[in-house]
Amino acid sequence: MKLETKAQGLRGSLRIPGDKSISHRSIMFGSLAKGVTTVRDILRGEDVLSTMQVFRDLGVTIEDDGDVVRIHGVGFDGLKAPQNKLDMGNSGTSIRLISGVLAGQDFDVEMFGDDSLSKRPMDRVTIPLRQMGVEVSGQTDRDLPPLKMHGSKSLKPIHYELPVASAQVKSALIFAALQADGESVIIEKEKTRNHTEDMIQQFGGQLQVEGKEIRISGGQTFTAQEVVVPGDISSAAFWLVAGLVVPNSKIVLKNVGINETRTGVIDVIKDMGGKIKLSDIDQVAKSATITVETSELKGTEIGGDIIPRLIDELPIITLLATQAQGKTVIRDAEELKVKETDRIQVVADALNAMGADIVPTEDGMIITGKTPLHGAEVNTFGDHRIGMMTAIAALLVQDGEVDLQRAEAINTSYPSFFSDLEGLLHG
């Protein structure tokens, strides 16, 4: 598709679609609780719809009237063997977390996904699950999907140090540990997003978190809850950057989730000199209104323990860095290579094709700015965040057209992205 270029300014306010991580987990915990859980402001992107369908296939009744999602929970012991293979679509969150849920189920399942998901390594989940007594096998020595699995009603507790900083792996092991005989200990490499831990407590469960160590006992039960999903900061990040780099812009984003394990992008924007303000802060819901406006930006260094707090925002942060004076160095981000695409290479290739100066490295990128951008053809390779990054980059293009291939990937996490963009262009 041909993208909008030569933006004269973005102005207006937006309510960001629901957080993808919390939307996935609300369906999972609602299914595993006893009673009817209601979820408002859920994200209806393709990934979350995949999770919803998988739990229906496992025997859970889920109603969606377009406003509220009602989940008739069955508990861990009420899940039923599916009639068919479980389709995870493009969703790494779905296949990894649901592997943990199914670890304690005494039936056969096969989980598969699209071409992109079929290239993502699952060994980081399958290795510890095997240690707990799960039979699971994938393709190649990295256990690529499809995965065949048979869980166990007598899961062994685990003491496990995560070799990578991954909220998905951590969450998969937490779901398995909730079904194990005894106490499990999971030790993170770096602190990652903690929505799973938060929701265990919200649904009446217990766990202990001390620093990077999580202790969790098996045999717990959950009680249905009312969940309101805040806006997704990963989706908001595209508008935060757009408001900073497009001339004559001021954007107000309402009800954005500001869980402290997810706000690295805000820290980086402040560090680069961006004009950003948080207001209407709700400490209970962990949400706020965020306002940004066009800013003069400077390069920075991004690495270490901030990386898990902004891993999904690094593509759009890279675009931000192309519009900052000086050099920006991103390091310790090798996890980008096993996302929907190799995001180090694909981001660098896409923005360099548009005139940026980006050198990919083993674990990140070196970006030299400020560079004007020009038209090019860019392929998302099925990666939603590459698509949205390119659409924001196109707004800065004064010369030529930007042709985005496979733009439909954006529906994975933000189906209303282009209509929201139109609103800001005419705000």
Swiss-Prot record:
Biological process terms in GO annotation: amino acid biosynthetic process; aromatic amino acid family biosynthetic process; chorismate biosynthetic process
Keywords: Amino-acid biosynthesis, Aromatic amino acid biosynthesis, Cytoplasm, Transferase
Residues that coordinate or bind 3-phosphoshikimate: K20, S21, R25, S166, Q168, D312, K339
Pathway named in the protein's UniProt entry: Metabolic intermediate biosynthesis; chorismate biosynthesis; chorismate from D-erythrose 4-phosphate and phosphoenolpyruvate: step 6/7
EC number: 2.5.1.19
Pfam families: EPSP_synthase
CDD domains, per the entry: EPSP_synthase (cd01556)
PANTHER family, A to Z: AROM/DEHYDROQUINATE SYNTHASE, PENTAFUNCTIONAL AROM POLYPEPTIDE
Primary role: Catalyzes the transfer of the enolpyruvyl moiety of phosphoenolpyruvate (PEP) to the 5-hydroxyl of shikimate-3-phosphate (S3P) to produce enolpyruvyl shikimate-3-phosphate and inorganic phosphate.
Family: Belongs to the EPSP synthase family.
Record protein name field: 3-phosphoshikimate 1-carboxyvinyltransferase
